[in-house]
């Protein structure tokens, strides 16, 4: 299912919410009616939480079906909550807190910012149980903001080159394409939320943008 709505009253749904094929993690202050929309669209249960006491969950964590890597400032009660959900939890070493902004991952691979240390890369590799590749994309290090990826496909910044798209295909093991959401927004990772069952994009997204999202994320294969 593909929905066009501003869940958090602005286009940046990927900054506030985290989703995998198993669950969605949403801020405590998100209205129950919005939580229900997420659950219906992504076909998962949603849990209300925070990271480091903050509602920017999508920016401060990255997850797949195998685990979750979070900001080093995560609170003990938050770690306990994730562990009780059956998640393998690890904090990223170093000074970088916005893990979700600098890592894009599915169950096959992850692309991370090149400034992450070897230690941080190893934590991501072990926790998410994936192969990790470090690189910049479209001249930027905010990989997680540039890419929305699931186990069925990926959508990345419209300025990505063919070589970069091919690189992402190799790492993630799925097909994908470039595009925008929200009437021209290139930071598709920040302004969309997706798993293998569905996606939510900014309310302002146009028909052609929706069609590209549907194709890039592999939903046409379900028709």
Curated annotation (Swiss-Prot):
State if Protein biosynthesis is listed as a keyword.
Answer: yes
For this UniProt record, the keywords arranged alphabetically read as follows: Initiation factor, Protein biosynthesis
> Which GO molecular function annotation, any one, does this entry have?
translation initiation factor activity
The biological processes this protein is annotated with in GO are:
cytosolic ribosome assembly
A matching Pfam family = eIF-6
Give a yes or no for keyword ATP-binding in this entry: no
Q: Its family?
A: Belongs to the eIF-6 family.
The record describes the protein's role as:
Binds to the 50S ribosomal subunit and prevents its association with the 30S ribosomal subunit to form the 70S initiation complex.
| NCBIfam families assigned to the protein according to its UniProt record, in alphabetical order | eIF-6, PRK04046.2-5
Protein name in UniProt: Translation initiation factor 6
Tell me what gene encodes this. eif6
């Amino acid at each position: 299912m593909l929905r066009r709505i501003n869940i958090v009253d602005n286009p940046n749904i990927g900054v506030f919410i985290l989703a995998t094929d198993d669950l969605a993690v949403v801020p405590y202050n998100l209205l129950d009616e919005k939580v229900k929309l997420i659950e219906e669209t992504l076909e998962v249960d949603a849990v209300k939480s925070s990271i480091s006491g903050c509602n920017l969950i999508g920016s401060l964590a990255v997850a797949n079906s195998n685990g979750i890597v979070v900001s080093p400032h995560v609170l003990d009660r938050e770690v306990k909550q994730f562990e009780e959900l059956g998640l393998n939890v690890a904090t990223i070493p170093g000074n970088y807190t916005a893990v979700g902004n600098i890592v894009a991952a599915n169950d096959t691979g992850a692309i991370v910012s090149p400034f992450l240390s070897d230690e941080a890369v190893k934590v991501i590799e072990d926790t998410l149980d994936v192969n990790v590749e470090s690189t910049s994309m479209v001249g930027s290090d905010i990989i997680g903001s540039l890419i929305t990826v699931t186990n069925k496909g990926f959508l990345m910044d419209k300025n990505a080159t063919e070589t970069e798209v091919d690189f992402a295909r190799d790492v993630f093991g799925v097909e994908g394409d470039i595009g925008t959401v929200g009437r021209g927004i290139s930071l598709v990772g920040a302004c969309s939320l997706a798993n293998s069952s569905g996606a939510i994009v900014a309310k302002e997204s146009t028909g052609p943008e929706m069609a590209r999202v549907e194709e890039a994320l592999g939903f046409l294969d379900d028709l």
